[in-house]
């Protein structure tokens, strides 16, 4: 027999996990490490740090890895250390007391869907503001003890790690996460095997493992397709956040929405409200519709239940934030759903179009979300108005200010973002019930009782911590790039912790105008090089790898920072993440934000700064429109002076320079004999006492319950009880009205006011007789009056005068309205007829409108 050169079969590798054994006295630490409660409890973080401070820094503050890598000798030493063991006992007792409180069942239960969650820099499943907001929301849901769960993705590579080349070019690196080293756990089925959720695409299934991140009392379920059950084309679905092409994005959104609902079903979880945090998750409603139809309801009946229990939060007016898919691509993966729903393909695709009959229009997830969610909200008061205008084409019979799009202004999770030094001050001077009543401004007024020098010392301590951290980061990056050591030393020496420090740190999208400060380089050079009043600017942020313009901004700022007059005065910090963000929002003196108004939907980094005595300098956009108080920060004028954006940029830059030169810098350096500025501390105290209490995540969560969750849950309950009787009745009523709508007509009218005009102070009666085609008082009428002084297609509703039904005979209903004009001028008016039913959530719930002659 001939002997081959080699003869080897293919090994069948199996996953093998070997865990480090903890002594019995320390086993509670494993439970602590696997619950992200430690991410916002500073005593828990201090405990892990005390186990081995050097190792804690090496493992980048990951307690799971820390416990795995503790040496046997160190574990034995910890057990014998009475001080550490007391800390272990105390922190674990605090944790168990927190966890053992039963959830508040009086409030609506919620399932929360989002593409990203920023919980800790250890768990890289976030990229920016949306994820930070979602992570903070789950933490506050836990603290407030509400009944909530969440669904997202466990990304193999997450978002990219950023570094800069020697010439300032952004380098994006995707590092694989080792799931066994993260504060998460596999979800197992009833047989103890990893749970698998099978998600249907048109002709096949994608198989997702399910993991759970324990966020205090809240369970966050994370889907993972990177497994051997899937093809090479589907394993990457959960590889990268916002990575891949549009086909992969669609596959992600199918997995999040449809797969998310299937996951909850498999876990036996039902909630009152389903909250789509951005349009990425909108397809969760498609699966819910399928479930109701499979249970015996018609499509229209199912839609009543799904809409009533769904909320869509939109986070941006920027077009790039709204996903559109070609019909061909959408059909490739969603072709089987019309049959499941009992509708046509055109009807399904039409739910994602502003004009359902326009076959050239792409399917938009945001539009689908609006059409399948009863309520829609923006994330600040201004953004709510912008969203009303943006979505107005969906409800053509109503003007933007009339539609139902609301708002809840974003907040931030106080325990996560308030530095430990500030937590000590708040604990010392504030009411003991502070954490349960964070939105109470009266409690925050206690900041005025804190001695000025204590606040100044706290601010200086945090500034020095920031400078030390920056020096470490800079040394690492310059060594990595083999930079000139002499230049590194020169730069580090120029970073003066006593200087006025200004931070501009956020995602580098062009509308955020990171370039604004560099409009007049010579003027900026004078500002930063004043020897008596030094000023430092810190920039940090990532640009999407596909955003060439954003990367160009980073390169430009980096190049300017390397010029001799700006070296050590303008500093760009690589790899903006949660850890760096916490340092910056507590360490600088001024937080600067310069977006193009009104493109900043909310912007929460400035709110985080408020919790740390850092004062805002910002365009009046996003949350700052509501937050700004005179004497508690600075704002650029709200009014836009120039339509030409370049001219507006120059004006805004000049305004910033002027505020710095004439107001901010002189105020900061107006020092007393003790070496600090009393006037500056006054601004800090005003900022904390009058602004901070209104921008906590506690207030945001309460707003969602008060404005949406509780009301929707109550309505859903009414629709669903008695075998969905009311849902069926409303669906039938809508179908009947829709069938007869075109036939409903005016029999007679008396409209002398709108036909001939009128005079102020005089009363006019208008009447209409309407043939309702057998419907029983099913329509309403109102006179809509517009101001006639606006150009183009802009409209402003001046007044709406409702008609009252006075009498009816058979199908004929008589409506009348008495109107007394109170202002002279030119107006436009028309009578609007609409379907009327007390069981509708709002007018846009059934958006049939007929304008009458």
Protein language model annotation of sequence segments:
Residues 1-853:
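Catalytic cores of carbohydrate-active enzymes across secretory and cytosolic contexts
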């Amino acid at each position: 027999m001939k002997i081959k050169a080699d003869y080897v079969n293919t090994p069948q590798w199996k996953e093998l996990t070997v865990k480090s054994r903890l002594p019995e006295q320390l086993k509670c630490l494993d439970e602590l490490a696997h619950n992200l409660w430690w991410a916002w409890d500073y005593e828990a973080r201090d405990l892990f740090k005390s186990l081995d401070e050097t190792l804690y820094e090496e493992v980048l503050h990951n307690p799971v890895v820390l416990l795995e890598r503790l040496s046997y000798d160190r574990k034995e030493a910890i057990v014998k250390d009475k001080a550490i063991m007391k800390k272990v006992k105390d922190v674990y007792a605090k944790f168990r007391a927190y966890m053992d409180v039963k959830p508040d069942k009086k409030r609506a239960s919620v399932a929360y869907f989002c593409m990203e969650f920023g919980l800790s820099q250890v768990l890289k499943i976030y990229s920016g503001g949306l994820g930070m907001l979602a992570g903070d929301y789950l933490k506050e849901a836990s603290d407030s003890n509400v009944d909530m769960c969440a669904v997202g993705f466990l990304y193999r590579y997450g978002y990219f790690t950023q570094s800069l080349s020697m010439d300032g070019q952004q380098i994006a690196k995707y590092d694989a996460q080792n799931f066994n080293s993260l504060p998460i756990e596999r979800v197992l089925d009833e047989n103890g095997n990893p749970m698998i959720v099978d998600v249907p695409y048109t002709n096949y299934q994608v198989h997702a493992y399910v993991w759970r991140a324990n966020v205090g009392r809240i369970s966050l379920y994370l889907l993972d397709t990177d497994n051997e059950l899937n093809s090479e084309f589907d394993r990457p679905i959960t590889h990268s956040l916002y990575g891949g092409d549009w086909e992969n994005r669609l596959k992600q959104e199918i997995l999040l929405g449809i797969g998310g609902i299937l996951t909850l079903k498999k876990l036996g979880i039902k909630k009152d409200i389903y909250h789509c945090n951005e349009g990425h998750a909108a397809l969760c409603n498609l699966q819910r519709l399928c479930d109701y139809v499979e249970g015996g309801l018609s499509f229209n009946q199912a839609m009543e239940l799904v809409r009533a229990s769904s909320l869509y939060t939109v986070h941006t007016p920027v077009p790039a934030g709204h996903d559109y898919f070609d019909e061909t691509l959408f059909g490739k993966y969603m072709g089987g759903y019309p049959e499941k729903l009992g509708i046509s393909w055109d009807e399904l695709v039409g739910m994602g179009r502003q004009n359902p009959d326009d076959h050239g229009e792409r399917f938009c997830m945001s539009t689908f979300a609006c059409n399948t969610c009863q309520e829609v909200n923006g994330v600040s008061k201004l953004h709510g108005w912008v969203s009303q205008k943006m979505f107005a084409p969906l409800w053509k019979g109503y003007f933007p200010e009339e539609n139902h799009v609301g708002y809840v202004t974003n907040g931030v999770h106080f325990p996560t973002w308030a530095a430990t030094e500030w937590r000590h001050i708040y604990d010392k001077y504030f009411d003991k019930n502070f954490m349960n009543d964070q939105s109470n401004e009266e409690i925050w007024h206690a900041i005025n009782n804190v001695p000025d020098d204590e606040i100044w010392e706290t601010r200086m301590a945090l500034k020095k911590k920031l400078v030390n951290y920056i020096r470490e980061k800079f040394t690492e990056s310059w060594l990595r790039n083999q930079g000139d050591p002499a230049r590194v030393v020169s730069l580090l020496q120029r970073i003066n912790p006593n200087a006025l420090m200004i931070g501009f740190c956020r995602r580098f999208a062009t509308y955020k105008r990171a370039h604004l400060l560099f409009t007049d380089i010579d003027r900026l050079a004078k500002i930063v090089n004043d020897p008596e009043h030094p000023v430092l600017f810190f920039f940090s942020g990532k640009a999407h790898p596909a955003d060439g313009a954003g990367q160009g901004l980073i390169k430009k700022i980096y190049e300017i920072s390397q010029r001799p007059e700006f070296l050590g005065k303008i500093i760009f910090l690589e790899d903006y993440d949660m850890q760096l963000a916490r340092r910056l929002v507590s360490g600088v003196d001024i937080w600067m934000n310069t977006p193009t108004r009104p493109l900043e939907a909310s912007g929460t980094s400035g709110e985080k700064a408020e919790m740390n005595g850092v004062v805002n300098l910002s365009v009046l956009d996003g949350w700052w429109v509501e937050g700004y108080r005179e004497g508690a920060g600075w704002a650029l004028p709200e009014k836009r002076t120039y339509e030409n954006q370049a001219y507006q940029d120059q004006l805004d830059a000049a305004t910033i320079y002027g505020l710095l030169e004439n107001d901010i810098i002189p105020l900061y350096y107006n020092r007393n004999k003790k070496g600090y500025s009393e006037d500056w501390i006054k601004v800090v105290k005003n900022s904390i006492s009058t602004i901070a209490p209104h921008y906590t995540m506690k207030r945001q969560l309460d707003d969602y319950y008060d404005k949406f969750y509780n009301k929707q849950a109550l309505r859903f309950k009414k629709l669903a009880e008695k075998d969905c009787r009311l849902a069926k009745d409303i669906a039938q009523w809508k179908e009947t009205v829709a069938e007869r709508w075109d036939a409903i007509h005016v029999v007679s009218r008396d409209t002398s006011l709108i036909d001939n005009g009128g005079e102020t102070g005089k009363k006019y009666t208008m009447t209409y007789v309407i043939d309702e085609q057998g419907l029983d008082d099913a329509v309403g009428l109102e006179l809509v009056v517009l101001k006639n002084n606006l150009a183009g297609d802009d409209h402003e509703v001046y007044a709406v005068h409702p008609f009252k039904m006075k009498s009816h005979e058979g199908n004929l209903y008589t409506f009348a309205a008495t109107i007394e004009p109170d202002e002279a001028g030119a107006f436009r008016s028309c009578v609007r007829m609409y379907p009327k039913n007390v069981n509708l959530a709002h007018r846009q719930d059934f958006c049939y409108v007929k304008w009458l002659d």
